[in-house]
C-alpha cells in the first residue's frame, strides 16, 4: 500500500504518484493509493524527484514525485507468461502480448495475484487473505515521425477476506478503472514540441456480503486531469517549457463523510513555465514558477531555481524551491465512526501547507565506481497533523489541525562499485531529522536512520546468464500512535537472497527465480511481515 511509503520524513500524503506522467487516484476520501494496481512486470524504470524541485508538478509534490514509466513494445510481435509461488500460498500469474510493427503499437496484459495472508490466529502482525486481478492496455499510432496519438486503459480488482471465525457480515471489495488519451507533435528540426493529455481515474469501494451474493457500494473516488505541455528550443543553449494543468477530484461516501450519503469535490487549475540555460557547456541554470488556483484555498505562486555543474566525472547540484499542499478531502470533511473504536473528524478551516525546500548534492560517476552525497532542508509551515482526544465518556476522537511548522533536515549517501567484473556492490545510508517545531518531537512515523546494502554476482553458466544476490535494509526505531498512546518500534534489519538464471531456448527465453525473503526471520507486531518466506518464479518469453 502506498500509505506505508515514506520519503525524507514525509508520508504518502506529500508524495505525488504518477504512471507515465498521469496521476493515480486515491482510495476514497482517505487518499491512500494501493500500489498493487501497478503491473510490476511492465515497469521500464521509476523516476523520482525529491522535494518540490520541479514546476511541472503541483499540490502534493512537497516530499517527492514518483513517476512509473511503463515499457514500450520492442519486437514486431512478442508474448510471454510469468508464474510465481511463495509462502502463505501466495501465487502470481501474468500473461502479455505486444506488437510494435510499423506505425502501430499495441500492448495488453492480464494478471491474477492471491494469498492466504498471515497472522489470522493472532500470532503477531496480521495481513488479510486477498485475491486480485487486473489488466492493462496500450494502443498507439504514429502518423509520421513528428506526430503520434496514444490511448491507455487499466483495470484492477482487489478483494480481501475476513479470517476464519470472523463475525463480520461483509468484507472489502474494490475496483480501479482508468483511461487516458495523449498525443504530440514536434517540428522537423525538433526545436518545438507540443503534447496534450486527458486522463480519467476512478475508484469504487464496496462491501461484499459473506452469506449472500450481493455487493453494496460504500463510496467512490475519481480524478479527471488534463494537461498541455509546450517545449521550445530557440538555440542550442536554451530550452523553454510552458504549460497548463487542470484537476478535478470528487469523493462520494455513504459513511466516511457523514451519517448520510455525501459527495465532496476539490478543483484546481495551474499555469507553469520554466527556462533552462546552458553556460560554458557545463553549467545548467534552470528557473521557473508555477501558479495554482485552488477553488477551496485561492491562488499560490511557487518559484523554483536549480543549478547543475559538470566537471570531468563529477556533477554538483544546488536547488531551492517552494511548494504547497492543499488539504485532502479526508482532512477537510471526514465525519466517520470507525466501528465504534474511534471517531475521525475533518476540519474545514484548515489552511494549505507551504514548504521551502533547499538541497545540495555532489556525485562521482566513474567506469567502475559511483558515489553521491545529498544534503537537504525542508521547512513546512502550517503543517497538518492528526491529534487524539479521549472524550468524557472514554471514547477516542481524532482531529486535524495546522501545527506551527515542521523542519526536516537530512543527508543521503549512495555508492555502487563493480569489483572483479562479476561482483556488483551497492549501499546507501539516510539520516533524516524530522521535527515538529511545536513539540520538539520527531514527526510520527519518521525513521531517523536507515540504509540498504547489496552484493550481486553476475556470470554465465549453461549458455545463459545467472546472478546471485544478497540484499538487506535496516531501520532505526520510529514512533507510532496506538489507542491514544505514543510508542516506539524496535530497530530492525531485513535480508533476502535471490538467484536468477536465464535459459535460451532457440529464439525464446526462460527465466528462473529463487528467492528467500526475511532471511533471518525477523518478526515484530509493529512490522507487517510474516517472517521468512520462499519464492519460486518462472518467466517465459516468446519472440
Identify the meaning behind each predicted range.
Residues 1-22, 26, 44:
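Extracytoplasmic beta-strand/coil segments of soluble accessory domains associated
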Residues 23-50:
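Short acidic/polar hinge/loop motifs at secondary-structure boundaries
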Residues 55, 67, 74-76, 96-174:
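Periplasmic-side early beta-strands and strand-to-turn transitions of outer-membrane beta-barrels
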Residues 107, 142-157, 173-298, 303-310, ...:
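Face-selective signature of the C-terminal outer-membrane beta-barrel domain
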Residues 159, 202-204, 250, 295-301, ...:
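Surface-exposed extracellular loop regions of Gram-negative outer-membrane beta-barrel proteins
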Residues 167-186, 219, 315, 322-380, ...:
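Outer-membrane beta-barrel signature, preferentially recognizing the C-terminal barrel domain
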Residues 278-285, 376-379, 401-479, 539-541:
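Gram-negative outer-membrane beta-barrel transporters
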Residues 381, 425, 474-481, 488-490, ...:
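C-terminal beta-signal and adjacent terminal beta-strands/loops
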